[in-house]
Amino acid sequence: MKVLSVSSEVFPLIKTGGLADVSGALPIALKAFGVETKTLLPGYPAVMKVIRDPVVRLEFADLLGEKATVLEVEHEGLDLLVLHAPAYYDRPGGPYLDPLGKDYPDNWRRFAALSLAAAEIAAGLLPGWQPDLVHTHDWQAALTSVYMRYYPTPELPSVLTIHNIAFQGQFGSEIFPGLRLPGHAFAIDGVEYYGTTGFLKGGLQTAHAITTVSPTYADEILTPEFGMGLEGVIATRIDNLHGIVNGIDTDIWNPATDPVVHTHYGPTTLKNRDENRRSIAEFFHLDNDDAPIFCVISRLTWQKGMDLVANVADEIVAMGGKLVVLGSGEAALEGALLASASRHPGRIGVSIGYNEPMSHLMQAGCDAIIIPSRFEPCGLTQLYGLRYGCVPIVARTGGLNDTVIDANHAALAAKVATGIQFSPVTETGLLQAIRRAMHFYADRKLWTQLQKQGMKSDVSWEKSAERYAALYSSLVSKGM
């Protein structure tokens, strides 16, 4: 089976979040199930800088008003189609934001162009290659299925994956003519959304199947609390909605071989984590004692529940624990966490910014990782924690609920528990979870059981890829 994947970011070329991890890892995992994937992405400067010897496969004289070229290149096991359109993508800043952190005012055109190019490839414009199915990711690629509906193309099935419904690609009605869609596409069954132009909304209306990145999140986005205004649209597509948990690259995230981990280990050699623990204490200037080290590796935002962490930091120390934080985000939260470190030298350490090697070492040396997100479509950090024996303490929401088995009496008795869940997502709820962790940590046999069971969890892409391959096959066989 041949699949065209369309994404605004793909790891390892360009990444701002989990979207890149999925669009980079899933095509490789799908190979084992006979799926050949070509991935279309924008030719940002960071992408053009690293690709080598690309081949020109397609040229557009007028892609929504600008010239563009589709380049094909292989990169680290990925078959890439790079949309080289300097007028759209060759600019400073990131994929979506200018150097001042503001949205590019023409983001609607930049990603409509990506979607239109994808629809043209789906229609057979790429010489010698015709996909059987198109898989698009988030609002930036969601117009692909809209163009496929309204432009004369082969009847190809399409899948739209929602990684985070909070990002919807909603623009004013005045941009609609620039999309070059027929007038009747600006309607309730098209891109119109309360008088605006909705990219994700249009994709939800036109894709043959919709997936989210966990079963719980698929249920949550049907509710006003999590649906962000689109719950009504999604409810009309409930028969085509699927929740499939993300995986992680277990070759990159492997405590037995990870090059940045000071001392390698596995489920039967957990004692080797002690050296990594000492390295964490040294980096964060912590006292070198046996108190449990709780860690946070996160964007420091309200959505991630970081205000809760800041507010309970003193209590963690009072209970006899230590806390280390790695991340950046809202200035007020950064300041609150730094202030807690100043109040408790040797017990709390905070590093503002992101440090990929340190994130690996923290998973390999800390005792538990706190993930108190108010909503979390899937989450990857808890999967890294499971893999590394860093016991996850998670809010009972989204993918956190689907991937961490709470250490309740039944799960402990059956020896299947892998972490600690809490609800409601409040300071009180988080403190209760940390108290439970402290209680379990005092019983080293029980704590080791939690670590080992977590490390046995299958967090690879294999099961997820199998489910995607099955979904693809069902759509293609139905001739949708």
UniProtKB/Swiss-Prot annotation:
Any single biological process term in GO: glycogen biosynthetic process
Tagged with keyword Cytoplasm: no
Keyword Iron carried by entry: no
Signal peptide start-end: none
Cysteine disulfide links: none
One GO cellular component, as annotated: cytosol
Catalytic activity: [(1->4)-alpha-D-glucosyl](n) + ADP-alpha-D-glucose = [(1->4)-alpha-D-glucosyl](n+1) + ADP + H(+)
GO terms of molecular function: alpha-1,4-glucan glucosyltransferase (ADP-glucose donor) activity; alpha-1,4-glucan glucosyltransferase (UDP-glucose donor) activity
UniProt KW keywords: Glycogen biosynthesis, Glycosyltransferase, Transferase
Pathway(s) per entry: Glycan biosynthesis; glycogen biosynthesis
EC number: 2.4.1.21
Residues annotated to bind ADP-alpha-D-glucose: 15
InterPro entries hit by this protein: Glyco_trans_1, GS/SS, Starch_synth_cat_dom
HAMAP family, per database record: Glycogen_synth
Biological role stated in the UniProt entry: Synthesizes alpha-1,4-glucan chains using ADP-glucose.
Family the UniProt entry places it in: Belongs to the glycosyltransferase 1 family. Bacterial/plant glycogen synthase subfamily.
Name of protein: Glycogen synthase
